[in-house]
Amino acid sequence: MSQEQLVAVNELNENLGKVLIKIARDSIANKLGILKINLEDYLSSLNDPILNKKGLAFVTLETYYGNSTSLRGCIGYVEAVAPLKEIVSKAAIAAAFSDPRFPPLSKGEFDNIIIEVTVLTKPQEIDVENRWELPKKIKVGEDGLIVEYGILYSGLLLPQVPMEYCWDEETFLAETCIKAGLEPDCWLNNKVKIKKFQGIIFREEKPKSEKILIIKPSEVKCKKEEISLL
């Protein structure tokens, strides 16, 4: 699938970001029984031409504690298998109920989660003759990474992750290898594919907030904490 057929991140704005967040929250609410809608009809009623383009996206859920948050689920799609509006709906439901790291989201948690939608560009494999040159081909604060080895090993980290944990490029590569279930230095293996992508982040300021933040990965603040539950 060509890049032209995908939603480009520069096509998205605050209003569309609000719609994407609403799709995610309404999809979860419907699954919980808080809303009672026909999800297929609901999505069909959203006729924006940009949302009808195929797209790539991740939905992240965080539990809100007032001054801090903790990860509650994160699932996404890096294959353009459906329109962006459907991808966000599917990713939201999967993040809430199918992330193997967490139990399914409960009704009692629904009003206390922050929803974040990251829309991605198409991943591109990084081609280098010398694997030690890989860190120079990556920009922390701009790129996300995918590590693939055969059909059994795959790991992805979003562009905001290395910013949150103050990583340099080599650490970012190593952590993505670990996410794929491989050794930290797997990126030096010529048989391991390394892909990069970019993204734009739409995030609720607070749970169920009307105010949506548009965040560039480079604007994400370092938490200076050990990585947890990625």
Swiss-Prot record:
InterPro entries: AMMECR1, AMMECR1_dom_sf, AMMECR1_domain, AMMECR1_N, AmmeMemoSam_A, Uncharacterised_MJ0810. Pfam families: AMMECR1 (PF01871). Residues 15-213 form the AMMECR1 domain. This is Protein STK_02290. It comes from Sulfurisphaera tokodaii (strain DSM 16993 / JCM 10545 / NBRC 100140 / 7) (Sulfolobus tokodaii).
